[in-house]
C-alpha cells in the first residue's frame, strides 16, 4: 500500500516525514535540507519553490512570496494583515474582502490566493517525499496551529486538495509534537506534558496527559496565531532602519531590495545570538553605495523583543487554568519550534516553572512533521507494534452553543471539550402558544451571543399550542473528529425533528473575529487585574502614611526628637499630597513611593518602638513599619 505522509506546513519552513519499517524518516529535499523554506518566487522565466526561491529573494523581493500562512483563511481587513503588509515587499490586494497576492510572472501581472501559494509549498513537500519513496503519494496528514480557526483549517485543507493530496486529517501542531515526544521517549506511567510551540509565525501551548506512551489526551490548548520568529526579525529590522537613518540620513524602508538584504542579515544575527552574546552585521553597498557594518548584543535584542517574549507566558497560564492544573503538576515541558532556541524565551519559561528544567530532547524543527507522519500511518491502518495502540484525543478550541432569551449564549459544548463529542439539552418556549423556535448556533467565549460568531441557524415549527415553558425541545450538538458540527432539534411531544450540519464554511471566522472573541474577554480580565493591583498598591501606601501619623500621636512618641518627628510628619504629608494628585499612577510608582517612605521613616519608627520598651505596638503600625524595614516595599496585607 502506498505510504501516507505527514507534512508540517510552517509559516517560514516546512517539513515532511513518513513512517515505515517501524520508524519515522524525516525526508531531506533536493538540496539535502530536512526543512524547506515556505517561499515561492516568480520570475520572467520560471517559478521557484523552497530553497531556490529563498536564495534569490534579494534580487527579486517584490515577486517572492512568503508568510502565506499569515494570510490563509483570513479577511483582507484583518488588523493583523494590515500590520504585516508594512513588512512585506510583495503586494497584497483586496479581492472581495479576501487577501490575494499580486506578482509579475513571465511578464504578466497575476494574483494568487494564499491557498494557492501554500499549495505550491505542499506540492514541493509531496515531490520531496515521492523522490525518496520512489512512488507517487496521495494521502497526507497536514498540521495547523492548535489555535487556528475553522476558516484557516478549511483553507489549509483546500491548499492540500489544490496540491493533489487527499488530506486524511488536519491535526494540531502541538498534538503532533506530543505524539513525537511520547513515542520517541518510551514514556512510562501517566505524565502531564506541556508543549510550548513557538515557530516562525505562530505560537501554541497545549497540555496533554500521556499514559504509557500510547494514550494521548489533550487537556487544554491556548496560543496566538500571530506570534513568532518573523515578529522578532521585524523588531530587529526596525532597530537597524532607525540606526541607518541616524548615521547616514537615508531611509532604508523605501528600498525593497535593501530592506530584504537587511532582513536576511537580521535573521542570521538572531540565530547567532542564540549561541553568542553578540552578532555582527556586514552588508556591502546596502544603499547608495554605503557599506553598512554594525553590531547587536543579545541584551539589546532581548530588550527590542521583551514584550513579545513576555507575552508567551499568558497562554501558558491560560492553558494551565483551563486544564485545572497548577505548575507543579506538569512533569515535562517540551520545546518545539525554532524560536524556542532563544535563550531569553527558555529562561522566562523556566523561571515561570520555578526553575524546572526544560526538555530539549526532541528536534524542535522536525517534531511536528514526525507526529504528523505517525498519525498518517495510524489513519492508513498501519499495524506496526509501535503505533497500533496509540490513541489520540484532541479538543475543541472554542465553545459552541445556542442563543436563548435575552440574547444569552447558552453553551452546549465548552471550549477544550474532547472531540468527538455529543451534548444534549432540553429547552422550551418563551411565550404562550409559541408555534415555532429559531435555533441559532454560535461559537465563542463571551456571555452574550452578539459578541460571538454566528455559525448557522434553522427554524423548528409546528409546536402544538401550549403555555410558555411547557413544550420540550431537545437540542443536540454533535462535533466529530474533523471539527464538523451537526446540530439537531426535536420537539418531544410530536417527535418533529430538524437538523443542520455546520461544516467549516469558508466565511466562518476571520482572524479578527477569533482574536476579538478570545482576546477581548482576556483583555478585559487583564485590565481589571491591573486596576486591582494599582488600587491595592495605592491603599497600602495610604494606610502606611496614616499609620505613621497615628504613631506620632501614640504613647512613647514624646520620646522622639523634634527633628525625627518633623521628618516623619513632612514625609507623610508630602506622600499624601502626591497620592491625591496622582490617583491614576502605575502600581510601580506607588511601590516606589512606598520604598522611599519606608527608607526615610523605618529607622525612626524602629527607634520609637525600642523606646516603648518592647511593649505592645500601637495600632497595627509596628507590624507594618517594622515589617517593611530594609525590604523593597510591602509584602504583607494590612491587618485590622
Curated annotation (Swiss-Prot):
<dbReference type="InterPro" id="IPR013126">
    <property type="entry name" value="Hsp_70_fam"/>
</dbReference>
<dbReference type="Pfam" id="PF00012">
    <property type="entry name" value="HSP70"/>
</dbReference>
<comment type="similarity">
    <text>Belongs to the heat shock protein 70 family.</text>
</comment>
<dbReference type="InterPro" id="IPR018181">
    <property type="entry name" value="Heat_shock_70_CS"/>
</dbReference>
<dbReference type="InterPro" id="IPR029047">
    <property type="entry name" value="HSP70_peptide-bd_sf"/>
</dbReference>
<keyword id="KW-0346">Stress response</keyword>
<keyword id="KW-0067">ATP-binding</keyword>
<dbReference type="InterPro" id="IPR029048">
    <property type="entry name" value="HSP70_C_sf"/>
</dbReference>
<feature type="region of interest" description="Disordered">
    <location>
        <begin position="608"/>
        <end position="640"/>
    </location>
</feature>
<protein>
    <recommendedName>
        <fullName>Heat shock protein 70 B2</fullName>
    </recommendedName>
</protein>
<dbReference type="GO" id="GO:0140662">
    <property type="term" value="F:ATP-dependent protein folding chaperone"/>
</dbReference>
<dbReference type="GO" id="GO:0005524">
    <property type="term" value="F:ATP binding"/>
</dbReference>
<dbReference type="InterPro" id="IPR043129">
    <property type="entry name" value="ATPase_NBD"/>
</dbReference>
<keyword id="KW-0547">Nucleotide-binding</keyword>
Amino acid at each position: 500500500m502506498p505510504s501516507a505522509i505527514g507534512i508540517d506546513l510552517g509559516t517560514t519552513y516546512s517539513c515532511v516525514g513518513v513512517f515505515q519499517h517501524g520508524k519515522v524518516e524525516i525526508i531531506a529535499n533536493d538540496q539535502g535540507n530536512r526543512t524547506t523554506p515556505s517561499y515561492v518566487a516568480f520570475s520572467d522565466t520560471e517559478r521557484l519553490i523552497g530553497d531556490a526561491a529563498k536564495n534569490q529573494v534579494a534580487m527579486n523581493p517584490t515577486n517572492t512570496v512568503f508568510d502565506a500562512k499569515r494570510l490563509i483563511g483570513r479577511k483582507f481587513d484583518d488588523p493583523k494583515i494590515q500590520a504585516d503588509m508594512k513588512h512585506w515587499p510583495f503586494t497584497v490586494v483586496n479581492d472581495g474582502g479576501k487577501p490575494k497576492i499580486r506578482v509579475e510572472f513571465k511578464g504578466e501581472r497575476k494574483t494568487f490566493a494564499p491557498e494557492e501559494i501554500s499549495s505550491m509549498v505542499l506540492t514541493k513537500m509531496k515531490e520531496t517525499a515521492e523522490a525518496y519513496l520512489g512512488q507517487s503519494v496521495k494521502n497526507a496528514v497536514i498540521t495547523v496551529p492548535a489555535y487556528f480557526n475553522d476558516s484557516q483549517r478549511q483553507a489549509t485543507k483546500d491548499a492540500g486538495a489544490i496540491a493533489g493530496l487527499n488530506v486524511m486529517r488536519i491535526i494540531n501542531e502541538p498534538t503532533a509534537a506530543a505524539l513525537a515526544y511520547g513515542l520517541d521517549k518510551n514514556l512510562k506511567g501517566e505524565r502531564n506534558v506541556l508543549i510550548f510551540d513557538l515557530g516562525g509565525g505562530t505560537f501554541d501551548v497545549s497540555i496533554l496527559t500521556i499514559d504509557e506512551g500510547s494514550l494521548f489526551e489533550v487537556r487544554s490548548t491556548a496560543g496566538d496565531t500571530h506570534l513568532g520568529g518573523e515578529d522578532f526579525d521585524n523588531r530587529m529590522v526596525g532597530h537597524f532602519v532607525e540606526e541607518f537613518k541616524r548615521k547616514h540620513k537615508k531611509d532604508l524602508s523605501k528600498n525593497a531590495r535593501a530592506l530584504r538584504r537587511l532582513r536576511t542579515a537580521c535573521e542570521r544575527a538572531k540565530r547567532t545570538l542564540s549561541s553568542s552574546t553578540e552578532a555582527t552585521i556586514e552588508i556591502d553597498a546596502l544603499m547608495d553605495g554605503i557599506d553598512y557594518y554594525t553590531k547587536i548584543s543579545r541584551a539589546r535584542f532581548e530588550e527590542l523583543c521583551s514584550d513579545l517574549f513576555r507575552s508567551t507566558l499568558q497562554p501558558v497560564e491560560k492553558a494551565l487554568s483551563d486544564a485545572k492544573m497548577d505548575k507543579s503538576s506538569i512533569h515535562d515541558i517540551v520545546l518545539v519550534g525554532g524560536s524556542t532556541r532563544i535563550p531569553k524565551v527558555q529562561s522566562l519559561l523556566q523561571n515561570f516553572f520555578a526553575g524546572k528544567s526544560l526538555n530539549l530532547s526532541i528536534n524542535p524543527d522536525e517534531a511536528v512533521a514526525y507526529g504528523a507522519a505517525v498519525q498518517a500511518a495510524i489513519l492508513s491502518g498501519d499495524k506496526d507494534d509501535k503505533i497500533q495502540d496509540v490513541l489520540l484525543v484532541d479538543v475543541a478550541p472554542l465553545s459552541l452553543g445556542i442563543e436563548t432569551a435575552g440574547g444569552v449564549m447558552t453553551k452546549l459544548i465548552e471550549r477544550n471539550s474532547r472531540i468527538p463529542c455529543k451534548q444534549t439539552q432540553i429547552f422550551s418556549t418563551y411565550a404562550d402558544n409559541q408555534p415555532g423556535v429559531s435555533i441559532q448556533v454560535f461559537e465563542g467565549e463571551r456571555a452574550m451571543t452578539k459578541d460571538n460568531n454566528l455559525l448557522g441557524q434553522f427554524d423548528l415549527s409546528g409546536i402544538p399550542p401550549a403555555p410558555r415553558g411547557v413544550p420540550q425541545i431537545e437540542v443536540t450538538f454533535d462535533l466529530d473528529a474533523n471539527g464538523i458540527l451537526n446540530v439537531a432539534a426535536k420537539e418531544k411531544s410530536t417527535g418533529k425533528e430538524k437538523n443542520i450540519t455546520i461544516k467549516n464554511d469558508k466565511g466562518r471566522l476571520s482572524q479578527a473575529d477569533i482574536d476579538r472573541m478570545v482576546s477581548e474577554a482576556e483583555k478585559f480580565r487583564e485590565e481589571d487585574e491591573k486596576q486591582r493591583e494599582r488600587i491595592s498598591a495605592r491603599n497600602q501606601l495610604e494606610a502606611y502614611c496614616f499609620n505613621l501619623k497615628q504613631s506620632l500621636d501614640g504613647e512613647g512618641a514624646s520620646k522622639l526628637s523634634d527633628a525625627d518627628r518633623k521628618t516623619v510628619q513632612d514625609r507623610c504629608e508630602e506622600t499624601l499630597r502626591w497620592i491625591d494628585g496622582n490617583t491614576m499612577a502605575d502600581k510601580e510608582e506607588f511601590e516606589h513611593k512606598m520604598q522611599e517612605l519606608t527608607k526615610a521613616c523605618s529607622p525612626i519608627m524602629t527607634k520609637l518602638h525600642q523606646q516603648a520598651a518592647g511593649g505592645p505596638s500601637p495600632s497595627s503600625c509596628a507590624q507594618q513599619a517594622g515589617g517593611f524595614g530594609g525590604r523593597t516595599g510591602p509584602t504583607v496585607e494590612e491587618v485590622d
